[in-house]
């Protein structure tokens, strides 16, 4: 008897451990992240209960996709670590919320400070992100609602349901009522799924069955009688983590993989300053023109370049909010010329460096510097500098500032793909 109890406890303990793990269910991607004050106090546009054990996030309009990602969980990786958040809301104010190039996560300052430093910067432009299972314990919860007659629920013609505490995102919800000739697919409305009687169609009668399809193709069925309106009901079902239902080596590899920060965009500057880069912290200069047209009609140049006049011991300092990973940088290349000639121009990544370029003059010179000569020993850095280490004023023209990466640099696309086979 004692042995049986121990076995049961072991099984329950294992089940709890599995559910509390955030299984990786997509490839790694690159995104942007900003802090937004205190933690959310409601369920946002999705209308979901707050998860409590993890933080919440809002997504830009494109990524939120009319609520299709409500309740999904993502692991976010910044310069100081990782945290898991659940999508509960969308944002539509400002350029970051309206752009379609990247996922833009808006999270609480508390969660932001788990992965970055909100006192030092207000964005992480090289965020790593990955879809994960939410790791909730227990089963999926449902809240029903719809029409009413004389103050009593009547779902004959109109019916809606919302779900919470699901570990895998919900792709589709279907309904089959008693007497119905076919299954009806419910329409998603943010965090709710609605059914309306079509003209001449059958009324909803009970018992009925809901069929939930997860983003990985899993299906759960829940048979129920007429439910009370507005009350949370435990459906006694839960999506299984991918590794519990699949022997695919690819899925297993993805579930073990931890994402790093997102890969840097190739260019710091090409026709314009790359997203996330600023020159605010440059020092001892007379001017910085990021849209100079003084290309001298060189074939490899575009229409614009950087023109800067540095005083003696002045620096052109490119800063990237939220930092960037240096691990996979192979080299830095750019095109440059100077007037008067300069033999003391240093280039370095991070706060200090000592690599000095060959003497530069009026003719355009294409430079490639191995990363080992300019980067620090830190895995994460925040800046790139061109430093005039001499007491004379120089004008520099610089274009096509580009990072080159090692062959083993993992790709981090802007939009991740679920890894289910």
From Swiss-Prot:
Family in the record: Belongs to the expansin family. Expansin A subfamily.
Organism lineage: Eukaryota, Amoebozoa, Evosea, Eumycetozoa, Dictyostelia
Transmembrane residue ranges: none
Record domain Expansin-like EG45: where: 43-139
Coiled-coil positions: none
Role noted for this protein: May serve to lubricate the movement of the cellulose microfibrils during cell growth and wall extension and/or may serve to maintain the fluid state of the slug cell wall.
Subcellular location: Secreted
Stretch forming the signal peptide: 1-20
Keyword match Magnesium: no
Protein name per its UniProtKB record: Expansin-like protein DDB_G0293186
Positions of glycan attachment: 19, 117, 391
Disulphide connectivity of cysteines: 46-70, 73-134
One CC-aspect GO term: extracellular region
Record flagged with keyword Glycoprotein: yes
UniProt cross-references to InterPro entries, sorted A to Z: Expansin_CBD_sf, Expansin_CellWall, RlpA-like_sf
